[in-house]
C-alpha cells in the first residue's frame, strides 16, 4: 500500500489527490499546502486524505511532511522546485513534477540538463524514480508524440500544437495560474531547429490550421514551453532523429496577451508613471482573476454563460515510412468545460492537466516504472505508454491517429 504526498492543492494537485483517493493500492493521500483552508476543503472530500500545512520555502518543512511516503507529487509553482527535489532526495522517496523547475540555474536549458544528469544520478543512487513534465502539455502530449513514432521509420519535424478556444461571459483569460501563463508569454520561446535548441520571439512564426472539429481556421504561435527541450535533447533515442521540434499555442489566452506584450505591459522592468515606479507585468497580473477551482465558482461561471467551448491538441510528426514522406497526425479528444464539470465538477483545464497528470502518478502506484533516476514524460517505455493511453481512454481522453502522404502544411 502506497502513501503519497501531494504538494500544492490547486487545480492540478487537488485533482490528483482525488484520483489517488480512489486507487485501491493507495493507503493515504497527504495533502500539503501553505493555505490551510484550501487543504482542509480538499481533505473533507477524501476518504484517505490527511492535511498538513507546509512552507515549501523551507526544505525541512517538506521533509517532515514526506516522512514515510512513497512518492512526492509536486504541484507547486516553479520557484519551489529545487527545494522539493532536494527534499525528495533527503526523504529517499520517488518524485513527480507537473512541470520542470526553472530555478535551478539562470538558464532553463542548463537546468534541465542538470536534472537529466546530476539529479538523475542522485535519484538512481538511492534506487528511486523521478519524472518531470507530467501534466497535459507537457505530459500527455509527450506520450502522444512518442506513440506517433511507431508509424515512422525516421522523423524530420514535430509540431506540438495546442489551441484553447474556451471563452466565458465572465472575464477569464486564463483557466490555470495567471502567473504561470503570463510568465510563459512574457519570455522568448524555445524551438529545436536543425538539431539545435534556439530561442524564438514570443508570438512569432505563426502557423494556421483548420481542423474538422473546429468551426474556423486557427492561428498558433511560438510559446515558451518544455516540449522542444525534452524532445530535442532526446531526439536521437526517442524521436527517430527529428531535427525540428516546435510548440505552437493559440486561443483566447494568446489573443489576450499578445497586444499586452506589444504594448510593453508584460515587461518586468520598472517604469515611471506619474512619479511612481511600477512593474508593468505586476500591474497586469494584479488585475487578473484567479483560475476557478471550487465547484461553486465553476458553476457560477457556467450559469453566467459560455461563449465557446472548443479546443485542439494535435501532434504532427513528419517523416519517412517505407520510403515515402508522410505526416502522422495525432488528435487528442477530451472533455470540454461543460462535460468536465458534468463528469467531475471541475474545469476542462483541471480535467485534462490534473486527470492526465494523475495517470503518471498511477504508473507509480501500479509499480510500472522500471527506470531509476530522473526522466521526463517523453521517455516512457512502450508498456508504460500503452497503459497510460488505455487509462486515459477510461477518463474520456482519446487519441485519433491519421497517417497520410505529406504534401506540406
Positions of PLM-derived features:
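Conserved Rossmann-fold cofactor-binding substructure of NAD(P)-dependent oxidoreductases
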Residues: 56-68
Amino acid at each position: 500500500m502506497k502513501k503519497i504526498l501531494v504538494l500544492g492543492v490547486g487545480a492540478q494537485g487537488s485533482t490528483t489527490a482525488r484520483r489517488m483517493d480512489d486507487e485501491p493500492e493507495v493507503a493515504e493521500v497527504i495533502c500539503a499546502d501553505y493555505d490551510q483552508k484550501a487543504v482542509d476543503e480538499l481533505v473533507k472530500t477524501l476518504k484517505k486524505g490527511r492535511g498538513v500545512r507546509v512552507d515549501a520555502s523551507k526544505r525541512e518543512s517538506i521533509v517532515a511532511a514526506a516522512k514515510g511516503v512513497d512518492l512526492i507529487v509536486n504541484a507547486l509553482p516553479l520557484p519551489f522546485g529545487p527545494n522539493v527535489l532536494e527534499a525528495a532526495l533527503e526523504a529517499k522517496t520517488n518524485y513527480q513534477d507537473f512541470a520542470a523547475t526553472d530555478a535551478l540555474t539562470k538558464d532553463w536549458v542548463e537546468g534541465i540538463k542538470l536534472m537529466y544528469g546530476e539529479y538523475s544520478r542522485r535519484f538512481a543512487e538511492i534506487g528511486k524514480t523521478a519524472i518531470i513534465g507530467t501534466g497535459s502539455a507537457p505530459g500527455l502530449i509527450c506520450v502522444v508524440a512518442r506513440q506517433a513514432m511507431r508509424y515512422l521509420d525516421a522523423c524530420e519535424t514535430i509540431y506540438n500544437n495546442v489551441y484553447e478556444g474556451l471563452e466565458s461571459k465572465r472575464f477569464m483569460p486564463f483557466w490555470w495560474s495567471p502567473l504561470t501563463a503570463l510568465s510563459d508569454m512574457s519570455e522568448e520561446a524555445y524551438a529545436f531547429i536543425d538539431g539545435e535548441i534556439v530561442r524564438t520571439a514570443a508570438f512569432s512564426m505563426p502557423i494556421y490550421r483548420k481542423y474538422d472539429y473546429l468551426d474556423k481556421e486557427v492561428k498558433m504561435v511560438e510559446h515558451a514551453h518544455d516540449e522542444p527541450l525534452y524532445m530535442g535533447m532526446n531526439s536521437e533515442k526517442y524521436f527517430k532523429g527529428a531535427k525540428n521540434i516546435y510548440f505552437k499555442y493559440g486561443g483566447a489566452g494568446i489573443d489576450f496577451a499578445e497586444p499586452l506584450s506589444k504594448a510593453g505591459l508584460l515587461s518586468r522592468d520598472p517604469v515611471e508613471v506619474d512619479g511612481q515606479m511600477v512593474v508593468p507585468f505586476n500591474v497586469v497580473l494584479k488585475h487578473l482573476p484567479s483560475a476557478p477551482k471550487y465547484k461553486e465558482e465553476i458553476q457560477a461561471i457556467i450559469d453566467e454563460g459560455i461563449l465557446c467551448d472548443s479546443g485542439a491538441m494535435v501532434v504532427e510528426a513528419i517523416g519517412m515510412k517505407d520510403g515515402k514522406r508522410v505526416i502522422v497526425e495525432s488528435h487528442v479528444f477530451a472533455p470540454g468545460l461543460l462535460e468536465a464539470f458534468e463528469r467531475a465538477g471541475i474545469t476542462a483545464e483541471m480535467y485534462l492537466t490534473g486527470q492526465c497528470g494523475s495517470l503518471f502518478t498511477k504508473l507509480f502506484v501500479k509499480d510500472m516504472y522500471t527506470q531509476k533516476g530522473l526522466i521526463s514524460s517523453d521517455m516512457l517505455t512502450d508498456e508504460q505508454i500503452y497503459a497510460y493511453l488505455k487509462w486515459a481512454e477510461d477518463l474520456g481522453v482519446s487519441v485519433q491517429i491519421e497517417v497520410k502522404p505529406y504534401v506540406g502544411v
